[in-house]
Amino acid sequence: MPSVAMLSVIAASGLMQFDVQSMGAASKLDAQNSLGLQAETGKIVANREVEERARRSGLQSMTADELERILAKNKGGHDAAVARQLSGFELKERLSNSRLQALIKSAPGPKSRLTLLVLADVSVFLAPAATEEPIQAPPDLGQQRHMIALTVDYLGKTLEKLPNFYAKRTTVRYEGDIQKVSPKGAEAQGAPLWRRVGSSEVTVLYRDGKELVDPRGWETRSAHPEVGGLVTKGTFGPILSAVIVDASHGEIAWDRWERGNAGTLAVFRYTVPESQSHYSVAAGFAEQAGGYHGDVAIDPATGAILRLTVKADPLLGSSTVRADIMVEYGPVEIGGKIYTCPIRSVSITRGATKMLFDAMGDSVPSEMVTRLNDVNFGDYHVFRSESRILTTDGPALNR
């Protein structure tokens, strides 16, 4: 069985999942050749953010500066009213963490602070504000090709050297209000008020290239702590190889320089057509492969992938209209050595919770809901054959 990265949600219409299957060594070599040629010919990838916004429900777009002015105008206002107002907005640029913390301090209460957190999470799929990007000339095609080759080499060598390890995965789940959909398919324009619907903490094992959730941490509970709502899996490696391999059969091109925590990052934008995609969306018992797009931010000196977004293209007839994931990677210490591993992830999905039949007998959504997960990874440890994972809810796990 190939390794799988999955983004799934339990909804009224059934299980909706988003799979990425990893490729073999031969495909990775093909990716190196194909990606290099694409960088050399300089293919241009169209901006897909307009398409993404078409999936949303009439929210008003604004910059971080405009958001700051709205909060200043509502200083001392009623917390619930400010939260409701903020829920009607979406950012048109990524909100930096430092900017977010400053905005949170000016929020009147917990409801508006929660809404700001969600607004920031939703914005992680966007580019930063132009004023926050480095002023630096784009690399020439030869430099682009070299960086892509470094990335393919990184995937082929570095990931294979990762030790078996385990880490703590902490997930906070958010959900917007259910919104009615008109018989003509137009979504209600009312802003969904976000709320926190739960959280979970599990131990994740990475062993022999596969991701496993330690069951001993939840076996005494009535249900798996991550069952229900939106669940993300497979961010430790397979998703990286699969996206790069798929992109080698699609299009990839230079996008921008970006400031990272440890220096300047090189960002490439990619698109994968449905015919070459190993990404699928399943609703109930029906599974449908579809195209996807996103961007990948790499260290230009080493090729290490430090940030990745995957955004599903709209699927005709699917009850899921959005299913996206972002993963950030950073240096972590495992067994006395430094490795690049996931440190944070944001997943978002929007889909139908209730379906009706129209006059033609086709099923159409009558209610829609948006769900979002904010995930943090930490407490990494090397996993040896004699390791014992101690949990608070069950006995130690031996391997």
Set out the residue ranges of the language-model regions.
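Intrinsic-disorder/low-complexity regions
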Residues: 18, 29-32, 46, 207, ...
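General marker for long, soluble alpha-helical cores
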Residues: 23-135
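Residue-identity detector for glutamine
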Residues: 17, 21, 32, 38, ...
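Glycine- and small hydrophobic-rich membrane-insertion segments that are intrinsically disordered
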Residues: 18, 23, 27-41, 352-368
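Sec-dependent N-terminal signal peptides
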Residues: 1-24
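Structured extracytoplasmic
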Residues: 126-292, 300-306, 311-325, 330-399
